[in-house]
Amino acid sequence: MGAYDELMKRRGRALLPLLDPDKVISEEDYYERAVKALCEYAATFLVGGSTGVGQIETEKTVALVKKNCDKPVTVFPGSPCQVAPSADAILFMSLLNSTNRKYLIDYQLEGSLLVYRYGLEAIPTAYIIVGEGGTAGWVGEAKAIPPEKPELLSMYVLAAKYLGFKVVYLEAGSGVKRSVPPEAVRLAKKLLGEEVILIVGGGIKDEEVAAEILRAGADGVVVGTVVERDLSAAERIARRVAGWT
């Protein structure tokens, strides 16, 4: 089953662990344990999100996941040099609220032939930075959407829907203090309906935050920093997302 089909199958309880190749290649033993621990709960593993990481590091991380889990591996690219031929899929993203056109369309043009050549499953994804934004917002030169401005979020979410994106990814930023607020998630899901998958990431530190986001209507949650820092907490989140606790 492909990555998109796995997301559809697990709508409302999809877990997407995010692995940073820069961290993985320096702590392989730890991440092998992490992949094994989260495998049964994951819809797909995301690989990427790093700055200064190329195809070699991304490929090594994809290989580590595939060695320890049979779930699809999806590239979460920071640039075209992270497109990995051994991956199963790629979030073919546009950072809609970036002020730099390379994150809107230039990187997509550069990467499109690689995606085609490698035969990756391309999942059209609208990436939208909300709130603090963290490193993702800074690197992506995004005008982060203030959570208290629902009309701004509505414009971006509807634009993503009408442009035909299959997935909308609301990102608060890695390691931020606050995740995307439930009311913002609820609004986004109301506007997207069942036509578009809604995933949310950033600031998901424990199972209660994850459950709150899913109750608000998200189809899935992305967890990255908590996997790096506290595998036990990541497992608790995974069990709650799966509905097993």
Curated annotation (Swiss-Prot):
The domain of life is Archaea
Pathway noted in the entry: Membrane lipid metabolism; glycerophospholipid metabolism
Its EC number(s): 2.5.1.41
Its EC top class is: transferase
Q: Which InterPro entries match?
A: GGGP/HepGP_synthase_I (IPR039074), GGGP/HepGP_synthase_sf (IPR038597), GGGP_HepGP_synthase (IPR008205), GGGP_synth (IPR010946)
Binding annotation for sn-glycerol 1-phosphate: 169-175, 202-203, 224-225
Chief site of localization? cytoplasm
Tell me which cofactor or cofactors this protein depends on: Mg(2+)
Which cell locations does it reside in? Cytoplasm
Biological process (GO), any one: glycerophospholipid biosynthetic process
Pfam families referenced in this protein's UniProt entry, alphabetically? PcrB
Alphabetically sorted, this entry's keywords are:
Cytoplasm, Lipid biosynthesis, Lipid metabolism, Magnesium, Metal-binding, Phospholipid biosynthesis, Phospholipid metabolism, Transferase
Please tell me where Mg(2+) binds in this chain.
20, 50
**MF terms in GO:** magnesium ion binding; phosphoglycerol geranylgeranyltransferase activity
Gene3D superfamilies xrefs: FMN-linked oxidoreductases
Tell me the first and last residues of the signal peptide. none
Q: What does this protein do?
A: Prenyltransferase that catalyzes the transfer of the geranylgeranyl moiety of geranylgeranyl diphosphate (GGPP) to the C3 hydroxyl of sn-glycerol-1-phosphate (G1P). This reaction is the first ether-bond-formation step in the biosynthesis of archaeal membrane lipids.
Record's HAMAP family? GGGP_HepGP_synthase
What family does the database annotate?
Belongs to the GGGP/HepGP synthase family. Group II subfamily.
Listed name of the protein: Geranylgeranylglyceryl phosphate synthase
User: Where does this protein come from, organism-wise?
Assistant: Ignicoccus hospitalis (strain KIN4/I / DSM 18386 / JCM 14125)
